[in-house]
């Protein structure tokens, strides 16, 4: 058999494998510093492939995603995929409890499947307060063509990132926190990495580049909006246009009209917006600070422009007002309660979302997690959950388990707040595999908090002001509470979530408020199948990085501007296909 026939045989074996399996998408990310002026002042920001914000990742349910990351920063790097569940592969989650940092000048390749998910998400760098300097971007998971969607196909799909922003870079902000200081009021709010349109000559400096979204009259667009900021809740609105809420973090919602919606740190929403206004002028897109003294924070407002293709003039006049609820603290909470799961719509699978009857499942574990204002522990300013300020392990949790490294963490996280003095510890929750956990998030701080759980979409069953008690369960929504991965907890209030622990691994449970997270307001939930023949969790990847107690296992990497040497079998298949095509042309 000649070489051509051998290659042809290999080609057909490989092509059969590829088409039988789920397809792959490939991205190369070069993460570096660039100089930009989002608020009119030159500053160092973190870019991906020279872009700020980074490129949008766009994939389809069940695709395998390969992201090769080259770290050109001067410090360690991890990318976290906010809301992507990483089914059975917490090794790819990109936080310190699951991954060793990618050293400067090194390449590392993430490879994971977006299994059984659809929706709107984002990614960001999770170490060293880096998100405050950028490195974030949108992450879109489209449904498969065979799965029905509960609305007509939009005429366009637009991603929007919003977030508070400081002119100081992440290293200066980090030092302020290390020195025990507050960060103070942000310098502004960015929309897609750009500063505000000059709607007011006093509040907005001249010469700032602003975001413009161009649309066609009469068309309907899907706007995917993510709050990628540091700690500020933002009210999102478009002058003169209704926002039809359609999806949030992978769950289709009951479709309702809003003139504006509060989007808290770490949250993502999809809106259907119809361009049904006249084109006498452009329209303002606004993201303004919430749950603060909004008179003082007036300058902390992001303003972009919605421009019809036949627009006759620039936007002018006052911004459209946000909610007038200065003396009504229930308005925002009632709006949040109005967001409900569309139980009849298909999600990533053909069956209706509501076929999972979460309200009838027996709870196996209950955790009441309380955060307080920052405290001083051993002379350092820290934040806590249940009186514990988390210290990240030097060795990732599941890697320590697999390679039998002891004393990395303790499975002793308390189910209720500690009564003694606060302490620093690597204390994590021992989750029961296939258990059903109730978590009550009690915010006894004066600031809004957002909480995120990696690895899962949890069910938001209740929220209210005051202290949670067992009687509060009588108010739970056990039918159509939204399933999502990030939930807000209002100051002096609680939010309750239910989690089906069907995804083995070690999963980060944290505040999304970057300052509080940096100071220790997090833990992990370790979920392990006790069966000795455990086949539910994939082993660590071949390219795993080693650190901490396992540092001696790490081989040096040859510094190169090229991609990783290997990104799996699919790359080999592609090479073989290319060789075969060349041989075919010669024959």
From Swiss-Prot:
Gene Ontology CC entries for this record: apoplast; cytosol; plant-type cell wall; plant-type vacuole; plasma membrane; plasmodesma; side of membrane
Membrane topology (UniProt): Lipid-anchor; GPI-anchor
Annotated glycosylation sites: 14, 58, 107, 169, 200, 257, 278, 293, 342, 362, 430, 444, 534
Principal location: secreted
Pfam families: Cu-oxidase, Cu-oxidase_2, Cu-oxidase_3
Subcellular localization: Secreted, Cell wall; Cell membrane
UniProt keywords, alphabetically: Cell membrane, Cell wall, Copper, Glycoprotein, GPI-anchor, Lipoprotein, Membrane, Metal-binding, Secreted, Signal
GO biological process, one term: cell tip growth
CDD domains assigned: CuRO_1_AAO_like_1 (cd13846)
Keyword Signal (UniProt): yes
Organism domain of life: Eukaryota
Family matches, as InterPro entries: Cu-oxidase-like_N, Cu-oxidase_2nd, Cu-oxidase_C, Cu-oxidase_fam, Cupredoxin, CuRO_1_AAO-like
Secretion signal span: 1-20
Entry annotated with the keyword Oxidoreductase: no
Positions that bind Cu cation: 80, 452
Lipid attachment residues per UniProt (GPI-anchor amidated serine): 562
Transmembrane segments: none
Cofactor: Cu cation
UniProt GO MF annotations: copper ion binding; oxidoreductase activity
Tissue note: Expressed in roots, hypocotyls, cotyledons, leaves, stems and flowers.
Propeptide, residue positions: 563-587
Record family assignment: Belongs to the multicopper oxidase family.
Functional description taken from the UniProt entry: May be a monocopper oxidase of unknown specificity. Involved in directional growth processes, possibly by participating in cell wall expansion.
Protein name: Monocopper oxidase-like protein SKU5
Species: Arabidopsis thaliana (Mouse-ear cress)
